[in-house]
């Protein structure tokens, strides 16, 4: 594994852990103050954390975060992400995890 792969992996697991912490705390708090650029960056971070949880297969925490985002479907689609594809991927991961538990 190259050093860049290790860094990507570490970043990925950090996002997963961060997502679990946010979910356990009731969700990711919205950024109410700051510049529009800071708010836009916060939205990207939210999407990144949510997608990392989905990819990891941690649907329980991902659903808490998705529920926490008002109008999650509109929110996700407004960021050029395909909501139906995300749900389909989450279901595939869930089925795979049930069929072959680690």
Task: Give the location of each predicted region.
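Charged, low-complexity intrinsically disordered segments and flexible loops
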Residues: 2-102
């Amino acid at each position: 594994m190259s050093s860049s792969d290790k860094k990507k992996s570490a970043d990925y697991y950090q996002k997963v852990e961060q997502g679990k912490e946010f979910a356990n705390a009731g969700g990711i708090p919205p950024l109410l103050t700051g510049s529009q650029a800071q708010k836009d960056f916060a939205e990207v971070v939210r999407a990144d954390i949510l997608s990392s949880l989905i990819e990891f297969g941690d649907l329980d925490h991902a659903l808490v975060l998705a529920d926490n985002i008002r109008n999650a479907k509109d929110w996700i689609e407004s960021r050029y992400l395909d909501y139906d594809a995300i749900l389909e991927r989450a279901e595939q991961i869930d089925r795979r995890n049930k069929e072959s538990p680690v």
